[in-house]
């Protein structure tokens, strides 16, 4: 009854107006699953590879080749298979691709099918996706990392860091956490406007003002938290995504906005000072993806008091994560389904992290869709943290809204992770 009888891939648009892959999977009993694949702007060199068309159509970014793979090779390989055997289906697709980075079939083709299969199987089981994937113990609602000021590759302004985030660690529910975030977001908008800054938003819904450096952005956020009636550090903590690989050049960190250059040790000390001066509890990609020595120095410096998240460093890859664990580098992994390209491998990365005492943060990409799968996966894995943008743009709020629904559905079983999500607090 749960055999796959039809798979349909199509080309749709993501939140940046670029093409992406959407996949429908239909089972023998009529159950249906649909998944749309996200895409990143700042991508790690070690990520699984998307299949794009090249040429002039959509300026080379079309995904007709990936859609053709879904409707052809992938359909032929898994039609008739049991959708409830996720591991076997994912492994079949990985073997069919045959490359180390999914460059033959395309991670966008494989992932779309992998997620749609899980959704169809969940429907066939009569279970919500978070319960189907996570089992009876899936009940933890994640603390959101809300990206309210954008810089770097996500915005057209002088700020070198990519994201400045707020974390409502003092809230008691996801519903309350979303309210905290919304109130600070709107307060920040007014303060920026009153100070003469533009209030246009970047790819992830955060503001992109022309501020001179990280401290200026953090000061605006601190003032807005207080003005909204919250206590910085107690009700709402701060987080950074430096995306340091983007400004790592010839062994140094080149801050073009500040017109400063820092070597790896100076970079680590700069981040340590920011974490000391502000209630920063999490720093993502503070060092470049292949600057392992810099990462080690940063981890030794502040890893016992600040969450250090590897995004480009680990690219949701269990093998790279195990290298980091062995070297004592970072203490957390950012989990992006399209970085690795299948649901099974995503879950494996979270499990590997948790077994080693590392935290895991479920994450969106800057190019998103209305698909809210990652909200379910955050609850399914009990990872306790989610990164899904600001409090604007429906591609971001779709995930918050899904978390609110899940919390309501869980009722008294639901537990908001709060401060406990960050083990060091």
UniProtKB/Swiss-Prot annotation:
GO terms for biological process: glycolytic process. It catalyses: (2R)-2-phosphoglycerate = phosphoenolpyruvate + H2O. It is found in: Cytoplasm; Secreted; Cell surface. One of its GO terms (molecular function) is magnesium ion binding. Pfam families: Enolase_C, Enolase_N. It comes from the Bacteria. The active site is at residues 204, 336. SMART domains: Enolase_C, Enolase_N. Signal peptide: none annotated. Mg(2+) binds at residues 241, 284, 311. Its main location: cytoplasm. NCBIfam families: eno. HAMAP family: Enolase. PANTHER family: ENOLASE. Catalyzes the reversible conversion of 2-phosphoglycerate (2-PG) into phosphoenolpyruvate (PEP). It is essential for the degradation of carbohydrates via glycolysis. This is Enolase. It comes from Brucella ovis (strain ATCC 25840 / 63/290 / NCTC 10512). The gene is eno.
């Amino acid at each position: 009854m749960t055999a796959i009888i039809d798979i349909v891939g199509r080309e749709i648009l993501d939140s940046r107006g670029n093409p992406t892959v959407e996949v429908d999977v239909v089972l023998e009993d009529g159950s249906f699953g649909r998944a749309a694949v996200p895409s990143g702007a700042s991508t790690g060199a070690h990520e699984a590879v998307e299949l794009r068309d090249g040429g002039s159509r959509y300026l080379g970014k079309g995904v007709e080749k990936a859609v053709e793979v879904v409707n052809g090779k992938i359909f032929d390989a898994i039609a008739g298979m049991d959708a409830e055997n996720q591991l076997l289906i994912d492994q079949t697709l990985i073997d069919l691709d045959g490359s180390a980075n999914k460059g033959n079939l395309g991670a966008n083709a494989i992932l779309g099918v992998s997620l749609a299969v899980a959704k169809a199987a969940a429907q066939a089981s009569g279970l919500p996706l978070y319960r189907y994937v996570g089992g009876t113990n899936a009940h933890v609602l994640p603390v959101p990392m809300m990206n309210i000021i954008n810089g770097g590759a996500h915005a057209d302004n002088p700020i070198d860091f990519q994201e400045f985030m707020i974390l409502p660690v003092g809230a008691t529910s996801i519903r309350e956490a979303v309210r905290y975030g919304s109130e600070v977001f709107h307060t920040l908008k007014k303060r920026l406007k009153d100070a003469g800054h533009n209030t246009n938003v970047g790819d992830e819904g955060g503001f992109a003002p022309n501020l001179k450096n990280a401290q200026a952005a953090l000061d605006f956020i601190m003032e807005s938290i207080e003005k909204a009636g919250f206590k910085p550090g107690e009700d709402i903590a701060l987080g950074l995504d430096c995306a340091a690989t983007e400004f790592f050049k010839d062994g140094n960190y080149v801050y073009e906005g500040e017109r400063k250059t820092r070597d790896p040790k100076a970079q680590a000390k700069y981040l340590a000072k920011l974490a000391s001066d502000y209630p920063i509890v999490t720093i993502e990609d503070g060092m470049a993806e292949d600057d392992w020595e810099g990462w080690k120095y940063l981890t030794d410096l502040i890893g016992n008091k600040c969450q250090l998240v590897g995004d480009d460093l680990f690219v949701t890859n269990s093998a790279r994560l195990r290298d980091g664990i062995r070297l004592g580098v970072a203490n957390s992994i950012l989990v992006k389904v399209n970085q690795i390209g299948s649901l099974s491998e995503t879950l494996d990365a979270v499990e590997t992290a948790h077994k080693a005492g590392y935290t895991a943060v479920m994450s969106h990409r800057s190019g998103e869709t209305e698909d809210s799968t990652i909200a379910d996966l955050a609850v399914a894995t009990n990872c306790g943290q989610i990164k899904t943008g600001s409090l604007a743009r429906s591609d971001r709020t779709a995930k918050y809204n899904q978390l609110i629904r899940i919390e309501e559905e869980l009722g008294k079983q639901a537990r908001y992770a709060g401060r406990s999500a960050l083990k060091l607090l």
